[in-house]
Amino acid sequence: MQQLGLSVIPESTGLVCVTPGPMNHRGLKYKLSDDAESQKTLELIHRMRDRLVKGSNMKSYKDELTLDWHDDMIWWGPGGIGASYTIDGYVKGHTKPFQDGLEFIKFNGHVLSSAEDDLGGWFGWPNLVMKPKGGYLGLTTASDIESEMRVVDLYRRDGYKLAENWIFIDHLHFLKLLGVDLLEKNKQLSYN
C-alpha cells in the first residue's frame, strides 16, 4: 500500500523503501548449495529463534542480540516499521515499539524452515499470537483480544553471525483481527 502512496499507517520508526536483496548480491543460486554451509545457517537462525522465544519471551535485549547478530546488521522491516541499521537502531526502531505495543502470548512454530548456503528463513501461518497493549503502529488500543501474526522471516549469515534480516508481516490480517481494517480506512481517506 505504501508503494502505491497510500498512507494508512502512521509514520514508520525506520526507513521505508523498496527492500533490496542481500548486500553480497548472492540471493540467486545458480548451483547446488553446500550442505555444510546451509546447516550452519539453519543452526544459527534456530539458535537465535530459541533464544528469543524460549529464553526471553519474545523480548530482544542488546546483550542477547550481540550473540547472534553482527553489530552493523540490517533489519529490513515491513511497512509501518521500516528498516533499521545496527543493533542499536534495531532496538530503537523495532524492538522497543514492538515490545511496548504488544504482549507475546504464544509461538505456534513454523510451517517451513530452510536454508541454502548463507541464506535461510522460515514462515508460520500464523506463527505468533499477540495481544495489544496499546499504541502498536499508532493504531491499536489495549485489549484482551488475541490476534494471529503471520510472518515470513529471511536471513543472511556472514561467518558465525547474522548480517541481514528481511521480515514480512501480514499487518492487514493481524490488525483486522484487532478491529483495525486498513483497507476500509483507506477507502474512508480516499473519499474524504
Task: Briefly describe each language-model feature range.
Residues 1-192:
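C-terminal and inter-domain tail/linker signature
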